[in-house]
């Protein structure tokens, strides 16, 4: 008998890094593939929708909540590292910083940039997450997905149509189950040092301890969204309980019990100011659920 709990009417504010979100009609937190498959079969039998919320970063959930089942993947963890071949097999709920540190400890080079990104492997693949001119697609060999009808599929990285913060998965109803990465061998001590330097830099330049979703806006390459926002004097600007970070202007923090509407209105205001001043229409990285 499967031991996974399916809980009802649970506040999603406790499941997002923004600390924002209304109740989930149902929520499940699978720990392994068997539990994940059980949950998907359950949604099919009940004929209710399924929304993947990962570990809750890069996500804005409506204060009214989400209908159907919310699939939280933060307990869906596991990493296997083959040091000799530089191959890493990782379940999609594993956090990027954890993987970055374990890769460094194993003497594998290429993932140092990911140490301060508060997201899961699954979310990183879907969004093609990156930093410091790196992105996960450069190291991704393949993924395993599960459809909402319960079918598994192995997809090569080159077939995912990656672009800047984009992938084929954003338009497909597929759950990322696991990823296979290929990294290069290096000296563990040096890789750990670079990894720690990257983390320290993030701690100094980003509101790491505040409630945020991560970066809000995509960079309108070659420009930086944060620079455009900062030049308009918007650091510290607030709408309700939502505030543009005084540390890094591409972060919106939950400064005082912000509502989902506070965040949406602040995003709308920033986009208007940037467009009026520069003629540039900023796009958001944030996934919105329940609106």
From Swiss-Prot:
It is an enzyme of class 1 (oxidoreductase). Signal peptide: none annotated. It holds the Pfam family FAD_binding_4. Its EC number is 1.3.1.98. Residues 19-186 form the FAD-binding PCMH-type domain. One of its GO terms (cellular component) is cytosol. This is UDP-N-acetylenolpyruvoylglucosamine reductase. It comes from Prochlorococcus marinus (strain NATL2A). The gene is murB.
């Amino acid at each position: 008998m499967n031991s996974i709990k399916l809980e009802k009417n649970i506040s999603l504010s406790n499941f997002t890094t923004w600390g924002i979100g209304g109740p989930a009609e149902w929520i499940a937190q699978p720990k392994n593939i068997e539990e994940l498959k059980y949950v998907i079969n359950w949604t099919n039998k009940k004929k209710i929708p399924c929304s993947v919320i990962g570990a809750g970063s890069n996500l804005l959930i409506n204060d009214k909540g989400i209908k159907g089942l919310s699939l939280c993947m933060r307990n869906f963890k596991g990493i296997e590292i083959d040091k000799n071949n530089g191959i890493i097999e990782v379940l999609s709920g594993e956090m990027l910083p954890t993987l970055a540190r374990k890769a460094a400890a194993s003497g594998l080079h290429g993932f140092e940039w990911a140490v301060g990104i508060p997201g899961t492997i699954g979310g990183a693949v879907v969004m093609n997450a990156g930093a410091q001119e790196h992105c996960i697609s450069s190291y991704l060999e393949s993924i395993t997905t599960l459809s909402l009808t319960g079918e598994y599929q192995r997809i090569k990285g080159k077939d995912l149509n990656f672009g800047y913060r984009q992938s084929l998965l954003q338009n497909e109803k597929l759950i990322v189950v696991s990823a296979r990465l290929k990294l290069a061998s290096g000296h563990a001590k040096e890789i750990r040092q670079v990894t720690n330097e990257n983390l320290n830099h993030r701690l100094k330049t980003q509101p790491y301890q505040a409630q945020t979703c991560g970066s809000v806006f995509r960079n309108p390459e070659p420009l930086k969204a944060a620079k455009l926002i900062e030049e308009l004097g918007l650091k510290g600007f607030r709408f309700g309980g939502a505030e543009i970070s005084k540390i890094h202007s591409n972060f919106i923090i939950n400064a005082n019990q912000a509502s989902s509407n506070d965040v949406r209105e602040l995003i709308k205001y920033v986009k208007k100011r940037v467009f009026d001043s520069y003629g540039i229409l900023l796009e958001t990285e944030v996934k919105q659920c329940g609106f």
